[in-house]
């Protein structure tokens, strides 16, 4: 398995903590050179990069100029994992509805598009590549006010991935979506009381959330599969059962 991916470059956006960190560790374990992208939190990103023998690169992926510079610096990217997101709970009181919409869409959708676009160009030239986009259970659920822009961005990501799948297929490039449910990250643990967490898990048929490592393992399995493209794969313990 290490030989299969040895020397390939994997770029993980939002790679400094939580699921992003687990993804970086999983691809490094497979022999990849790992690029840990981050917007904020240099120390955390550098710690992950040091742990996996990779490189931490700061980039606001909502800026096309910044994304282009990042890809110029990194060189050929074989595997892109679009994991970065704007946290729906980080909205500040002074932000207008329009400003918040732009902030969420800028990272969660535009950023995924820009990174996918620049990655795909090189992948097509080398006739091999993997695009994986991390979505959410919220892409399927009727959103409340807090989650409206987040849910819309994640749902649109599904169409974006199918477009990339169509464009990349003649060149051996695949594009898929992984839509996890509840992931038991440190952020989730700090935000939910034990009672709230128990209530969340009670609504999941399998009765639990997933660990970041469990999701990262499954993400790697998707990337390994060269005959899978244009698909949306759910990993949520039965919280949403696709028809």
Language-model features: where?
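Conserved glycine-rich cofactor-binding loop
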Residues: 9, 16-17
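The beta1-alpha1 cofactor-binding region of Rossmann-like NAD(H)/NADP(H)-dependent oxidoreductases
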Residues: 42, 58-69, 98, 213
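Conserved mid-core segment of classical short-chain dehydrogenase/reductases
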Residues: 85-102, 145-149, 189-192
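Catalytic Tyr-X3-Lys loop
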Residues: 86, 97-114, 128, 132, ...
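Catalytic loop of short-chain dehydrogenase/reductase
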Residues: 87, 132-156, 161-170, 182
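Amphipathic alpha-helical dimer-interface segment in Rossmann-like NAD(P)H-dependent oxidoreductases
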Residues: 107-128, 165-166, 170, 220
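C-terminal substrate-recognition "lid" of short-chain dehydrogenase/reductases
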Residues: 128, 211-235, 240
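Short, flexible catalytic-loop segment of classical short-chain dehydrogenase/reductase
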Residues: 140, 179-190
């Amino acid at each position: 398995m290490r030989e299969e991916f040895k020397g390939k470059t994997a770029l993980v956006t939002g790679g400094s903590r939580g699921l992003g960190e687990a993804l970086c560790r999983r691809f490094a374990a497979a022999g990849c050179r790992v690029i840990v992208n981050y917007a904020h939190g240099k120390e955390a990103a550098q710690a992950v990069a040091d742990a996996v023998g990779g490189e931490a690169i700061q980039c606001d992926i909502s800026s096309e100029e910044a994304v282009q510079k990042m890809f110029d610096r990194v060189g050929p990217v074989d595997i892109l994992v679009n994991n970065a997101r704007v946290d729906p709970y980080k909205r500040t009181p002074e932000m207008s509805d329009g400003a918040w919409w732009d902030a969420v869409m800028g990272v969660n959708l535009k950023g995924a598009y820009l990174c996918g676009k620049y990655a795909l160009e090189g992948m097509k030239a080398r006739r091999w590549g993997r695009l994986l986009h991390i979505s959410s259970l919220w892409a399927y659920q009727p959103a409340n006010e807090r989650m409206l822009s987040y849910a819309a961005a994640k749902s649109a990501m599904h169409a974006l991935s199918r477009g990339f799948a169509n464009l990349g297929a003649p060149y051996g490039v695949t594009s898929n979506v992984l839509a996890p449910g509840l992931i038991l990250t440190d952020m989730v643990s700090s935000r939910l009381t034990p009672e709230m967490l128990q209530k969340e898990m009670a609504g999941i048929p399998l009765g639990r959330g997933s660990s970041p490592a469990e999701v990262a393992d499954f993400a790697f399995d998707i990337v390994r599969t060269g005959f899978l493209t244009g698909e949306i794969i759910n990993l949520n313990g039965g919280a949403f059962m696709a028809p």
